[in-house]
């Protein structure tokens, strides 16, 4: 399905320092991007927390950055704050844009490209695919309280990349292997609505996590995203949410 992304913030980044600037600011290894390729990542705080989730594509002599509309102004402000002495220019891009999703596995691989998309972001079918892919919505599934390695962004972290803002705490936790929580998929019995923040319980840990997003799956169950403590995040395990049994799923599923 072609999902409309016309509301997303998009910037064309040019200038002689464009690659070095983005390499030192984002988690994305832009130096490794071939022309036409793209990568997902984040801009982090110095303490390693996720300030904004972004996609960067290399197109000729420019980089194209895309992010959700809700964090577009914040993202540009972060770029401009760090671009003090750098030869970089940020140009807003407007007009129709879309992203093509075929299945949960394809979601994170799909670039944001020009052209109208026929399916709105709010469509239930889009939401089901989004949740099964672990494609996060900023402010719901990830915010400044989270580290990238707790989220599906972990699959894109390049630990051979050089220094960038927030890199040290990310690398330290990776070396120690002691992340306390992670985002997981959940299949919940029943299709009654689940609220954001609903508590996840387990016999071994009463406060095992909380729900961030949920939608009726259309088959009598509910599918959801939620952060689970490492003691209960094993795939195939069961937890309880509002008195309902839920099975833990790997992302994507």
Question: Which residues are covered by each model-predicted region?
Answer:
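Anionic-ligand-binding alpha/beta catalytic cores of soluble enzymes and soluble regulatory domains
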Residues: 111-187
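A generic structural signal for short beta-strands and their flanking turns/coil linkers
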Residues: 7-9, 39, 52, 61, ...
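Glycine-rich, small/acidic residue-mixed loop/short-helix segments
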Residues: 49, 151-157, 165-167, 171-253
